[in-house]
Regions:
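Electropositive, beta-rich accessory/interaction domains or terminal extensions
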Residues: 1-122, 131, 167-186
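Short loop/turn positions at the edges of beta-strands in beta-sheet-rich folds
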Residues: 92-94, 140, 150
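Loop/turn positions that initiate beta-strands
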Residues: 101, 151, 155-158
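Active-site glycine-rich loop that binds ribose-phosphate moieties when present
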Residues: 127-134, 138-148
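Short amphipathic alpha-helix initiation/capping segments at coil-to-helix junctions
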Residues: 138, 150-153, 168
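Short hydrophobic beta/alpha edge segments that flank linear recognition/processing sites
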Residues: 160-164
């Protein structure tokens, strides 16, 4: 398991549907090591702290494995790491095998899995598609948030190691299904 890309971005104003909105969903890959702090990565911020960021959403990761699905699903788009607003594009970590509460060593930082991503309208803005949130939720490819247990640094190609598994064994995918799955059987 490893980090494929480290991506950061700062808030900026974007015109969308005739409105000017602040967003930091536009992340760009960076070279070299980046410090992971308690609430974010150096060079990265969230635009709306009422719904983004905070201790339980300090770092957002998205599996590189999902990009091939999206290339097939949306063939007219060109994809680059960070496209989903993730700080870490990872390899070998998936929603169905990561549990809420699992602790991982990512580079020199210790992170804990906290929750799946629950996208806001800015994902639709990022992709220029009104149906993007619906597609994202239906795909089951949510990615996952981490809290920072021990700050450190991370770079593309940093190793990822599972330090401990939460004994409750509730996966990120389980939580995403509870939030976004069909409500008749939940």
């Amino acid at each position: 398991m490893k980090v494929v890309s480290v991506n950061v971005g700062l808030p900026r104003e974007v015109v969308w549907k005739g409105m000017t909105v602040q967003t930091a969903i536009f992340k760009e890959p960076v070279a070299g090591a980046v410090a992971i702090r308690d609430l974010n990565l150096v060079g990265d911020e969230q635009a709306d702290l009422t719904v983004h960021g905070g201790a339980d959403k300090a770092v957002y990761a998205y599996p590189a494995e999902h990009y091939e699905f999206w290339r097939r699903e949306l063939p007219d788009l060109t994809f680059s790491w960070g496209q989903f607003g993730e700080n870490l594009t990872t390899e070998g970590l998936m929603e169905d095998t990561l549990h809420i509460g699992d602790r991982l060593r990512v580079g020199s930082a210790t992170l804990m899995v906290t929750q799946p991503r629950m996208p806001c309208y800015k994902l639709a803005l990022r992709f220029g598609r009104d149906d993007m949130i619906k597609l994202f939720l239906a795909s089951g490819r949510s990615g996952f948030y981490f809290s920072v247990i021990e700050p450190g640094s991370v770079a593309a190609s940093s190793e990822i190691e599972v330090l401990s598994r939460d004994p409750n064994c509730v996966s990120v995918a389980d939580i995403a299904r509870l939030y976004f799955g069909p409500s008749s059987d939940q």
